[in-house]
């Protein structure tokens, strides 16, 4: 249903944001 597809989109966005945050953290720790 609509809720399920919304959950799927939210998960995708959350994954994307988490990935970007992790990349920034890695840059701070190890340098880019």
UniProtKB/Swiss-Prot annotation:
GO terms for cellular component: extracellular region. It holds the Pfam family Antimicrobial_2. Expressed by the skin glands. InterPro entries: Antimicrobial_frog_2. Disulfide bonds join 27-32. One of its GO terms (biological process) is defense response to bacterium. It is found in: Secreted. Keywords: Amphibian defense peptide, Antibiotic, Antimicrobial, Disulfide bond, Fungicide, Secreted. Belongs to the frog skin active peptide (FSAP) family. Ranatuerin subfamily. Antibacterial activity against Gram-positive bacterium S.aureus and Gram-negative bacterium E.coli. Weak activity against C.albicans. This is Ranatuerin-2La. It comes from Rana luteiventris. The lineage of its organism: Eukaryota, Metazoa, Chordata, Craniata, Vertebrata.
